[in-house]
Amino acid sequence: CLGVGSCNDFAGCGYAIVCFW
């Protein structure tokens, strides 16, 4: 659930955590 680069699911978190492009 860590990292940046997507507005979609992060590694199976089920929701966006951060939204950097």
UniProtKB/Swiss-Prot annotation:
Covalent cross-link site, 3-cysteinyl-aspartic acid (Cys-Asp): 1-9
Disulfide bonds: 1-13, 7-19
Modified positions (D-tryptophan) in chain numbering: 21
GO biological process: defense response to Gram-positive bacterium; negative regulation of protein kinase activity
GO molecular function: protein kinase inhibitor activity
Key words of the record: Antibiotic, Antimicrobial, D-amino acid, Disulfide bond, Protein kinase inhibitor, Thioether bond
Biological function: Inhibits chicken myosin light chain kinase with an IC(50) of 8 M. Does not inhibit bovine cAMP-dependent protein kinase or rat protein kinase C. Antibacterial activity against the Gram-positive bacteria B.subtilis, E.faecium and S.aureus. No antibacterial activity against the Gram-negative bacteria E.coli, K.pneumoniae, P.aeruginosa, P.vulgaris, S.sonnei and S.typhosa. No antifungal activity against C.albicans.
Name of the protein this chain belongs to: Tricyclic peptide MS-271
Organism (species): Streptomyces sp
